[in-house]
């Protein structure tokens, strides 16, 4: 029997988190930061569009 190598985790690329402007040399964060605790907020579409902080539980609903 051959043993399988453990699966390696793929790390997210920086391009997924940042908008990069090569002409100006600027990196801008794509997601919002939580106004309460300062961590990164996630955008959820279902059941209603909203930004949610997983750390402190703050939720901001879209209009």
From Swiss-Prot:
The organism sits in which domain of life? Answer: Archaea
Zn finger spans (C4-type): 34-56
InterPro entries documented for this protein = Ribosomal_eS31, Ribosomal_eS31_arc, Ribosomal_zn-bd
Q: Give the SMART domains listed for this entry.
A: Ribosomal_S27
Alphabetical UniProt keywords: Metal-binding, Ribonucleoprotein, Ribosomal protein, Zinc, Zinc-finger
Q: Which Pfam families does UniProt cross-reference here?
A: Ribosomal_S27 (PF01599)
Residue sites binding Zn(2+) per the record? 34, 37, 53, 56
Query: What does the cofactor field's note say?
Result: Binds 1 zinc ion per subunit.
A single GO molecular-function term is: zinc ion binding
Q: Which cofactor does it need?
A: Zn(2+)
Q: Name one GO cellular component term.
A: ribonucleoprotein complex
Q: Name one GO biological process term.
A: translation
Q: How would you summarize the oligomeric state and partners of this protein?
A: Part of the 30S ribosomal subunit.
Q: What NCBIfam families does the annotation carry?
A: PRK00432.1 (NF001669)
| Family the UniProt entry places it in | Belongs to the eukaryotic ribosomal protein eS31 family.
**What name goes with this protein?**
Small ribosomal subunit protein eS31
The organism named in the record is Pyrobaculum neutrophilum (strain DSM 2338 / JCM 9278 / NBRC 100436 / V24Sta)
Gene behind this protein: rps27ae
């Amino acid at each position: 029997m051959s043993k399988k190598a453990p699966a390696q985790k793929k790390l997210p690329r920086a391009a997924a988190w940042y908008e990069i402007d090569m002409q100006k040399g600027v990196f801008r964060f794509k997601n919002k930061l939580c106004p309460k605790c300062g961590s990164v907020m996630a955008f959820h579409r279902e059941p209603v569009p909203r930004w949610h902080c997983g750390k402190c539980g703050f939720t901001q609903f879209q209009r």
